[in-house]
């Protein structure tokens, strides 16, 4: 779809527009870092406005801002959600460094629960399909189970759905969960959920800022084709020791922070653990079951001087699920990140990151007496630059290199009588490299453009043993039986670790534009191409998040996604309206042949085919952002489909080559979120979600063959589970509502699934022993769950 000529055109436009907006008028740069007055924590996304010039800028992920203005006297206003605005007069006869601190606002009436656009500023920005939540915003989201949950918050937005009870992750605009790039302090997390999606892996007390990109993804992000969830942890209090935590019936948490060297260095350490299994049976299985999680967040930060800062952060989390003598399941993420901020000048900011990420997944099948372990590990080097060329032009550029090690599986016998022997599948290795440039340009008072280009390369490295197939075809088609079968390797070869098995190169253009129709409304449009080189091999019908990651290579092509979106944004005095439409195509989405075996499969290429997906939809969001009653209504009408045609004219393909619903297709997705300030001491909250049931494939008949009953299935994903819906309510009792006191605490009363809806996680079929008839059996994970949590902070 994308041609080299188009790349040249985009770069030419970017350069010409950059030159055209610059003038010869004498100008100087105003720059600095914005922090919270109480803690010294740097602030992301603070609006730095110059009203007289109708221009401004926002602070970056490290609280830094830079804007070039004409020589003279300027009134500058600093604003951020939940903080008191600050204005000052600055005489700009030379470059000025103006670092300030903002005080938290004591007035809660006008705190916006959800910040998708700060109207006056972001109506003009070319970015669309973006949602930002800050730390103080997250705290005001209606609380269920005693603590704010960022994943539950984003699944209340249009275009975002949960993966369903009993499943991990979330889905964005008809994409799969593995197509989301989830970052914590720039480190990749491969699983974003705890306890079957009931909790997220993000400790709300440790989070500073969250940004979700559903479309219009900036060029600095790559490697996934559906969305980017970019989360930054707090740095820690540089001025005083403090603690935040909560004690509840289902889980507890504690976070400690304080200065190492006052006003220069700080530490943060926070932990959480659940114990819900002690009180609540998860499934009615007749077996004793255990399900719990724990995680740990850590961070050290140090300001070497005004131009250099160091950060060392980490995360460790584990989930354990044990179902009696049936199976046990353990999985989790580990990350470590060292970052160095350097300010080359008042207009050139840089960040160098060295990142380690690891994901482990273990499954013990007790009835089969063996343990299966798998995982993925990567080492990531990133060097990002931001150049504030002028008040109308900002350039971002950088390099990124990732080294992958894939563990496709390791099998351990768990008893002496196990029929399984120890087996280690061959590890796989790969390099992913990229360079990018992205420019944000104010073309006129009404038109703003963001255009960028990412060049990515993925190289599959050598390994000890590689299968060789006749005609390079690992899957053969049996025309007589109309089935796909595994091809028998004709040989195996060894390739040196530093040699290339297969290499891919992709250009990924990104462009967004905003045209301001009036002071309170704008029209936006965006296009982005993204490439994804790693694939999740997962049985989506499993009640556990069965995860095996595989690299692209000689038999599995990288996924390529193209997305177009248009939107209309309108702000009113107390309300705002956002409407977006999108269309997305993905090439080389893997699809499984019928009866594909995934566990301990040394040759996964023998059970997958390359297909394609498409998704399109309309999204609507109405927000009420002022007054005692605040909240939003979100609705999405969408379609997500997949097709895997035959490779030749005689092959039937998957589902006879016809389009079928993906497992994450939701025709209707409606959510209502509200919070009501009853008094200074009491806050009431409620969430309601309704979604079309998840697609499923059910048998439509059966036959007997050699004494065995064989089910006959209908078209793939032609049926659906029942509609998914539940209502959650909460009441927060603020025990100490006077904001100036150092100690603050509250009690949160909440009920998840008030009317005890038995939402189906899966449906299976069995023979009724009394009647001999087949019957459907629905597995429901969660019913009604009441909870009480005591939260505190000092």
Per-region residue spans from a language model:
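Short, acidic Ser/Thr/Gly-rich low-complexity loop/linker segments typical of extracellular
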Residues: 53-64, 502, 506
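Surface-exposed extracellular loop regions of Gram-negative outer-membrane beta-barrel proteins
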Residues: 360, 405-417, 459, 464, ...
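Periplasmic N-terminal accessory/gating domains of Gram-negative outer-membrane beta-barrel systems
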Residues: 84, 118-120, 124-217, 228, ...
């Amino acid at each position: 779809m994308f041609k080299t000529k188009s790349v040249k055109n985009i770069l030419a436009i970017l350069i010409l527009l950059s030159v055209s907006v610059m003038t010869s008028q004498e100008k100087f740069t105003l720059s600095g870092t914005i922090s919270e007055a109480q803690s010294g924590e740097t602030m992301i996304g603070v609006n730095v406005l110059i009203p007289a010039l109708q221009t401004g800028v926002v602070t970056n992920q490290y609280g830094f801002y830079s804007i070039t203005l004409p020589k003279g006297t300027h009134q500058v206003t600093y604003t951020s959600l939940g903080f008191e605005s600050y204005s000052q007069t600055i005489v700009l006869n030379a470059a000025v460094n103006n670092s300030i601190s903002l005080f938290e606002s004591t007035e809660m009436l006008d705190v916006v629960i959800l910040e998708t656009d700060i109207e006056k500023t972001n109506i003009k920005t070319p970015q669309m399909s973006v949602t930002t939540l800050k730390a103080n915003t997250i705290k005001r989201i209606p609380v269920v189970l005693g603590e704010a949950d960022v994943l539950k918050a984003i699944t209340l937005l249009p275009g975002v759905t949960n993966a369903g009870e009993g499943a991990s992750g979330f889905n964005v605009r008809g994409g799969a969960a593995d197509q989301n790039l989830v970052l914590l302090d720039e480190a990749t997390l491969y699983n974003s959920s705890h306890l079957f999606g009931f909790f997220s892996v993000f400790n709300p007390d440790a989070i500073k800022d969250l940004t979700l990109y559903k479309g219009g993804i900036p060029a600095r992000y790559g490697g996934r084709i559906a969305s980017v969830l970019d989360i930054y942890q707090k740095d820690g209090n540089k001025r005083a020791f403090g603690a935040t935590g909560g004690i509840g019936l289902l889980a507890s948490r504690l976070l400690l922070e304080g200065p190492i060297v006052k006003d220069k260095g700080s530490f943060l350490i926070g932990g959480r653990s659940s114990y819900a299994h002690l009180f609540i049976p998860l499934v009615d299985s007749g077996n004793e079951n255990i399900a719990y999680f724990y995680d740990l967040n850590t961070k050290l930060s140090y300001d070497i001087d005004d131009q250099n800062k160091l950060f060392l952060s980490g995360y460790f989390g584990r989930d354990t699920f044990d179902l009696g003598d049936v199976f046990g399941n353990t999985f989790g993420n580990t990350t470590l990140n060292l970052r160095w901020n350097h300010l080359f000048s008042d207009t050139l900011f840089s960040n160098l990151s060295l990142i380690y990420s690891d994901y482990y997944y273990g499954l013990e099948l007790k009835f089969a007496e063996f343990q299966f372990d798998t995982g993925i590990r990567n080492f990531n080097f990133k060097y990002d630059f931001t150049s504030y060329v002028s008040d109308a032009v900002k350039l971002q550029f950088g390099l990124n290199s990732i080294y992958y090690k894939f563990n496709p599986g390791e099998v351990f016998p768990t008893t002496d009588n196990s029929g399984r022997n120890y087996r280690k599948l061959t590890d796989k290795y790969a390099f992913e490299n990229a360079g990018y440039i992205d420019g944000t340009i104010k073309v006129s008072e009404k038109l703003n453009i963001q255009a960028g280009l990412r060049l990515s390369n993925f190289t599959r490295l050598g390994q000890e043993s590689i299968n060789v197939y006749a005609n390079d075809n690992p899957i053969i088609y049996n025309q007589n039986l109309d089935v796909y079968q595994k091809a028998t390797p004709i040989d195996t070869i060894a390739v040196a670790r530093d040699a290339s098995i297969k290499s891919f190169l992709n250009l990924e253009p990104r462009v967004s534009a905003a045209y301001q129709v009036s002071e309170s409304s704008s029209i936006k449009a965006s296009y982005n191409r993204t490439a994804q080189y790693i694939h999740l091999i997962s049985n989506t019908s499993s009640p556990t998040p069965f995860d095996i990651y595989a690299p692209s290579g000689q038999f599995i092509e990288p996924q390529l996604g193209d997305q177009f979106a248009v939107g209309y944004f309108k702000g009113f005095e107390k309300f705002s309206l956002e409407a977006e439409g999108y269309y997305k195509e993905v090439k080389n989405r893997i699809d499984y042949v019928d009866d594909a075996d995934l566990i301990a499969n040394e040759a996964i290429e023998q059970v997958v085919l390359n297909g394609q997906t498409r998704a399109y939809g309309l999204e609507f969001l109405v927000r009420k952002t002022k007054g005692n009653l605040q909240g939003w209504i979100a609705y999405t009408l969408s379609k997500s489909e997949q097709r895997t045609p035959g490779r030749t004219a005689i092959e039937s393909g998957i589902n006879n080559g016809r389009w079928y619903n993906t497992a994450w297709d939701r025709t209707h997705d409606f959510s209502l979120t509200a919070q009501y300030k009853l008094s200074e001491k009491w806050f009431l909250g409620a969430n309601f979600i309704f979604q079309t049931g998840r697609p499923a494939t059910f048998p439509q008949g059966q036959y007997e063959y050699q004494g065995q009953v064989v089910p006959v299935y209908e078209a793939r994903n032609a049926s659906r589970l029942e509609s998914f819906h539940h209502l959650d309510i909460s009441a927060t009792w603020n025990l100490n509502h006077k904001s100036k006191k150092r100690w603050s605490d509250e009690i949160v009363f909440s009920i998840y699934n008030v009317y005890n809806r038995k939402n189906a996680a899966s449906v299976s079929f069995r023979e009724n022993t009394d009647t001999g008839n087949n019957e459907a059996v629905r597995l429901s994970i969660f019913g009604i769950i009441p909870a009480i949590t005591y939260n505190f902070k000092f």
